[in-house]
Amino acid sequence: PEFYKFTNKLIPNKFPSLDKDHPRLLIPFRDEEGEVFAYQGRAFGNEQPKYLTIKLQDRDKIFGLDRVTKKEPIYVVEGPLDSLFLDNCIAVGGADFDRPLSIEGSLITNGELTVVFDNEPRNKEICKLIEKTINTGRKVCLWPESMKHKDINDMILGGYTKEEIQEIIKQNTFQTPLAQMRFVTWRKIND
């Protein structure tokens, strides 16, 4: 069914107008017990917005909680589809990692987090978020200059394997103070 119409069945009148309604890929966000607490509709074409996320409960939009092993290192990416290509990975449903990562204590017992932003070195907003994340002391992947794909999904479509991507991430993950030094170089390369 169309996305607005489907959503209105769950949350009456969430979309008062059904104008420009169209089918979308439905991506369920599940909690640790597997219960759906939100879902995201991804446009199949060039429709805007590309993503619409609907919360069914007042929880942070973290995708993959039902699949993550808390005692293992955890990757944190922007998009749910990207998270499906990495082992032990969650997604925050956008580029804003602040709120979801502020509850990381509830996510992790013995593991650690590595934040993997999309590869958008010319996006000033993403650069600010990367710098902010580095300054918190978290591990961050700074994609190599040779990587031309925008995100993990694009890398897969471009012929990279999951194992190759995970190795690239591993080789290009840094933490303070090395992350700060690498970020300065990375930003200059991509200015």
Regions found by a protein language model. Give the residues of each.
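Replication-associated primase and helicase/ATPase modules
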Residues: 1-18, 28-33, 76, 108, ...
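Short, acidic/turn-prone active-site loops that include or flank metal/cofactor-
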Residues: 94-99, 118-121, 145-147
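Phosphate-handling DNA/RNA-contact segment within nucleic-acid enzymes
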Residues: 1-112, 126-127
